[in-house]
Regions:
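Recognition helix of helix-turn-helix/homeodomain-like DNA-binding domains
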Residues: 33-49
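The DNA-recognition helices of helix-turn-helix-type DNA-binding domains
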Residues: 35, 46, 61, 72-75
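Short, charged recognition helix plus adjacent turn
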Residues: 69-99
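Short alpha-helical "recognition helix" segments of helix-turn-helix
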Residues: 24-29, 39, 57
Length: 99
């Protein structure tokens, strides 16, 4: 079974919020009170969603900051697991040491 690719929260912001609501990145930036470069970098997957940005997005879209931080956290965990797989796979579970 093929594993799905890791989706950056910026892609979700773009595809599930900005496009369907017909909002420009410029307008979103102005409404949130953040630089347009921050919004553009998030959408392109070049920047993480910080706690500050998560709170601003939650106020604007009416969802929770935990939603946005959860997306970012899930993305970061998957990226870390992929990048350090060889290192992590050599760690033995605690119960394997006792055997």
């Amino acid at each position: 079974m093929e594993k799905l690719s890791n989706i950056h929260p910026g892609e979700i912001l773009l595809e599930e919020f900005i496009k369907p609501l017909n909002i420009s990145a410029y307008r979103l930036s102005k409404e949130l009170g953040i630089p347009q470069t921050r919004t553009s970098e998030i959408i392109k997957g070049h920047r993480s969603i910080t706690a500050d940005t998560a709170i601003r997005l939650s106020y604007y879209f009416g969802n929770s900051a935990k939603f946005w931080l959860g997306l970012q956290n899930d993305f970061d965990l998957e990226e870390e697991k992929k990048s350090k797989y060889q290192e992590f796979k050599h760690i033995k579970r605690l119960n394997e040491h006792a055997a």
